[in-house]
Structures are given as structure tokens and as C-alpha cells.
Amino acid sequence: MLFRSVYGAIEIFFILLLIPVLTMKSMADEKHQKTDQLLYTSPISINKVVLGKYLALVTLFAIGLLIVSLYPIILQNLVRSVAEEGSTSYTVNYAVAYGSTLGFFLMGCAYIAIGVFVSSLTESQVIAAVAIGVINIFTMLMTSLANMLPSSKIFMVCFFAALIVLLAFALNFWIHNKWVSALVGLVAEIVLFVLYFFFSSHFDGLLYNVLSAISFTDRYTNFTYGILDVSAMLYYVSVSFLFVFFTIQRIKKQRYN
């Protein structure tokens, strides 16, 4: 319990403060300093530039986490000395300690990938930091927020219909083609209502189920009990890969424009 409480505080510090600070300059500063043009004309490919920035940030994160990983050893030595004085003994569960560290590292890599992508969308470091912080807070609290919303089928279908509209606008912002965006949105709305018509019973509490499935922190819970959740590990790696890919495509699009 002591270790989990300490790691909970470390998790909040890393995710809500350290990662936004680390990633806010990664791409936004290039635009602000107008050095992004050098990236576009560099003999090094955009893929390598983005991947290099991402891996550099992951390395910094890993160094910080490496220091934190000394805590279980220090704690064990501390409680051993206390036990020798006649107090109740306490043994650090290293499986829990380092399982949590591994899970937290992979989760942090995913958060860093998202942060780098958000940084590529703006030239303001402040806006990037705030946006990354808000996104990170949302991912930590989204299942709790979902519990506060109605779980009725009607609300669920209306919510996802509105979400599709927002995603269509986001797609238009990305590809600058309103007809393709409108078509994709229309097809998605049709699919949604067809699914609702035939499988309406599955829409009860659907939002909570979806958010639980994609929640970073919910998937991290197993690691805090010493369980190496392979599906969670693959999920974090997939999210990292996906957002690094999004960042590369974003930079390439700016280059061609």
C-alpha cells in the first residue's frame, strides 16, 4: 500500500507536469523559431527527425524513472533497519515495484508520443503545454467522468452522433477537403444508426465501456499488482507508434504545403 501510494503521487507528477514540460517544445519551438524550414530541406528524412526527437524525450523520461526505480531498494533497506530495532517488519514486493515501473514507462512513452503530436499542431509552447496537460488530465479521469453521465441508450447514440460530427470537422482540418470529410461523417452516422437499430441493447453504458477499454490508467492498474498485462503493453506500444506516425504525417503535410 505504501509503495502504491508513493507511485500514485509520482504518476501524477510525471503525467501532469513533467511530460507536458518535456514535450511542449519538441515541435512547437521549431515553428516559433522558424527552424522548421531546415527540417523540410534537411538531407535527413522527416521520419528520422521525428523519431529522433521522440526517442530523445523517451530517454529523458527513462532517466527520471531510473532514479525513481531506486526507491524500492532504498525503502527495503530502510525498513530492514527499522525491523532490527524491534518494529514490525515490512518486505518490499519487487514484482509489484518493478512491474509498476515497466508499466509506467510504457504508459509514459504513449503520453510522450501524444505530447509530441500535439506540439506539432501549434507554434506556441504555452498552448501546447496546456493542451497536453488537459488531454492527460482527461485520460486519467475519463472513466470517472463517464460514470457521471447518463448511461441510457438514447443518450449514448446522441453522444456518439455528436462525436462523429466533431471528428468530421477535425478530419476537414487535417485534410482540408470538406467533401471527403462530410462523406466520411455521413457514412459513420449511417453505420451508427444501423448498429443502434439492430443492436440497441449494446448501447447501454457503451460510453463507459469504450472509455474503460482505451483508458491508460485503467490498463495500468494490473501492473501495480505485479501482473504483467501483455494486452496493456501492446496497447501502449500501439498508441506510441500511432501518434509518432501522426506526427510524421503532420510534418510531411506542412512540408508539402
What are these regions, as identified by a protein language model?
Residues I19-T23, Y71, A113-G115, F246-T247:
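Hydrophobic/aromatic residues in alpha-helical transmembrane segments
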Residues P20-Y40, K53-Y54:
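Transmembrane helix boundary and interhelical loop/hinge segments in multi-pass membrane proteins
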Residues K253-N257:
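Short cytosolic juxtamembrane segments of multi-pass membrane proteins
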Residues N47-L51, V118:
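Alpha-helix N-cap/helix-start motif at helix boundaries, enriched for small hydrophobics
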